[in-house]
Amino acid sequence: MRLYGAIGPRVDGDYFAQELASLDRGDFDMIHIRMNSPGGNVFQGMSIVSAILSMNTPVCVHIDGIAASMAAVVAVAADRVCMMDFAKMMIHDPYFTGESGKATSPKQKKALARLTDMLRQVLVRRGKDEATMAKLMREETWFSAAEALDAGLCDEITSSARNEFMNLDPMQLCLLYTSDAA
């Protein structure tokens, strides 16, 4: 499966959850989700999180570029998270869309506090303790793949075969081509 783009109208949480459920009825050892998303709607995203957490088949999310905001929460709900070596992950406290993004009424502040707690509960399942995660969310923290690995937010850093090929020194390249010709 692929989760590319913003979670919301483009990546509908209900539809995505239904697709996951149909794959869960299949004969798969693992379900792989490729991700490159700036995040999006918390309510749509939590539909995907709930679907991932209720799967019988293990789920692996591969972060191909960015997993920011709600997409990061979706990613860490998986059984396994792999990030490309150049990929980034970002977590932050939720906010209202609009002019200021800030909660103004006591009711809005209470709602945002509850949403923040809900998202943090998913993140702490595999990362830092609750107090540390709250601080990282409040500060809007960006992680490189190595930093996400250190924080427990991903399990593996991957690189493409092309990157590995480009990193070979000239002697290794010569040996590679001469051994194929023999």
Regions found by a protein language model. Name each.
Residues 1-70, 77-182:
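N-terminal organellar transit peptides
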